[in-house]
Amino acid sequence: MKPQVYHVDAFTSQPFRGNSAGVVFPADNLSEAQMQLIARELGHSETAFLLHSDDSDVRIRYFTPTVEVPICGHATVAAHYVRAKVLGLGNCTVWQTSLAGKHRVTIEKHHDGYRISLEQGTPGFEPPLEGETRAAIINALHLTEDDILPGLPIQVATTGHSKVMIPLKPEVDIDALSPDLNALTAISKQIGCNGFFPFQIRPGKNETDGRMFSPAIGIVEDPVTGNANGPMGAWLVHHNVLPHDGNVLRVKGHQGRALGRDGMIEVTVTIRDNQPEKVTISGAAVILFHAEWAIKL
């Protein structure tokens, strides 16, 4: 069977919204060099290649147009959505292996498609960014100290991929942000973190709006980012920002509106002793089109 190539929008059920990814299934007969060429040709921020695995249900390799990466949230949702549709799966739990290790993925079938949930890595936090570094980040976003939620740090958080959490007051016009990309790139080199995630909480709701800038790795702005919203959920628990029952915090993370690609990620944080223990991100997807590779590979 020739590789089938899919164009998928993840973290949305509406075409041309959310975050697009390429999916190639099956990809067992492709070499690493061929995978990289296909990812470059498709031009998505990430393309997922689904392969047979001896110790899990599926192995996935992820490629940007220029390099292989360990894992990608929206491409994972896209990949499992395609696999579920092709194989006609019902409600189930599967395990995937990747360069990031072994992860549990939950698949829920609905009348209009599937909802895919990915369990992320262990939450972690670096010391708050203070002094000149904090000021440089605020200045690079063309904000002021008065725009930041009082009493809360600007801080690197991770569930496998680190992002800088930047909590904004609700009245800040987040869609109007136009950061200094060169300044953010320079700061990335200083702090060893490539993603900046300003976000704000919708008043009275467990819902957020965010944007993710990562110019140091060639991504001016990512539409909807699982590896930003997941750490954000953990950060919100870590700093006791939103109310929860002591066991679970659920947050709807909205992103992509400023790019005309609005999407939504459901973030579920399992809590132990008032600290985040486990983070799961969930979302829908939609297949725009698929095609069989026409040339001999």
From Swiss-Prot:
GO terms for cellular component: cytoplasm. One of its GO terms (molecular function) is isomerase activity. Keywords: Isomerase. Transmembrane segments: none annotated. InterPro entries: Phenazine_PhzF-like. Its EC number is 5.1.-.-. The active site is at 46. The keyword Isomerase applies. One of its GO terms (biological process) is biosynthetic process. It comes from the Bacteria. SUPFAM superfamilies: Diaminopimelate epimerase-like. Homodimer and homotetramer. Belongs to the PhzF family. This is Uncharacterized isomerase YddE. It comes from Escherichia coli O157:H7. The lineage of its organism: Bacteria, Pseudomonadati, Pseudomonadota, Gammaproteobacteria, Enterobacterales.
